[in-house]
Amino acid sequence: MGTVSSGPTMEDMFRHMKQLKPYLEKNKDVILALQAGFIGAWGEWHSSKHNIESSDANKRIILEKICRMTPQDRVVQVRVPDYKNLLPKDSEAYRKTSFHDDFIVVDPHRWDGNMHEGTPNFDQIVEEGAFMPVDGELPWGTWSMNKENGDANGWIIDGKKTARQLFLEHYTSLSVIHNYKERGAPDKYSMMYWKETPISEEYLKEKHMPVSDGYFRKHDGSAAQRNAFEYVRDHLGYRLELQELQIDTLKHTDNHILNLSLTLINRGFSTLFNEHPVYFVLVDEHNQVKEFLTNADTNSFQPYRPGDKTYTP
């Protein structure tokens, strides 16, 4: 981890990729996505001993080889769209490259990779993130809460604004390693403050963000209070909500034909990815089980039609 006295050459990286490729293929059933490392300190594509990241050609070659190392039906995530855009747009490598924003601060910052709202990079993640897993993390709380801006309370990353960004960019997952509970430190970091930040149904509807009818209700029907941390936790990835189940029985000679029709709404931030066969399962009064495989494509379970600025489910 971090920097070392001597770093790998590109040839070292390629040899390592060759070693990893069969292992990744063998274990792809437990892999959602691979994050592109290899270059520099912490694999963050900076500060390499051989200055590899100074060449766009080097970065493109390495990313293409990482994509070839990765199982065909899994994606690779890069830290900023600029790296993906080194690839030809009509290439297989481009189509399988997604995003991992490791500096989510929402508001503009010199180190945010030009990925705050209103930038081409932000818009690219919004457009392309609908079709591939997107991941990210906040900076370390021990860094962002160091009063660098002269704020007596440190630099708290806004929970409600973050929730909106995660929704717009179709986030599948978010690390809780950074800016939550770090290294046993007693300080409160941003995600702890999110737990104290109320979020209302009115706010979510105003921002066209997903919310279920009963999300702000307890089991007894009384009002439930929600906070920004809970909302992010509950809506990362997919959140399938049953709308209607129709069951029609038709008699045909001595047999009965059962027609089933199920309607769902996805109230999450993203659709499902990778392989998820869908079955109807029937259990009779004797606990005998019958499974019926459907032709449902779970990758199409979008929260709303991609590109729809009304975000209608």
Annotate each language-model stretch with its function.
Residues 227-241:
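Proline/serine/threonine-rich low-complexity linkers at boundaries of modular beta-sandwich domains
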Residues 33-40, 44, 48-203:
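Catalytic-core regions of glycoside hydrolase
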Residues 1-9, 35-42:
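Substrate-binding cleft and catalytic face of glycoside hydrolase catalytic domains
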Residues 6-33, 57-69:
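An active-site-proximal structural segment forming one wall of the substrate-binding cleft
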Residues 291-313:
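A beta-strand/beta-hairpin structural motif
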Residues 271-279:
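Short coil-to-beta strand junction motifs in C2/discoidin
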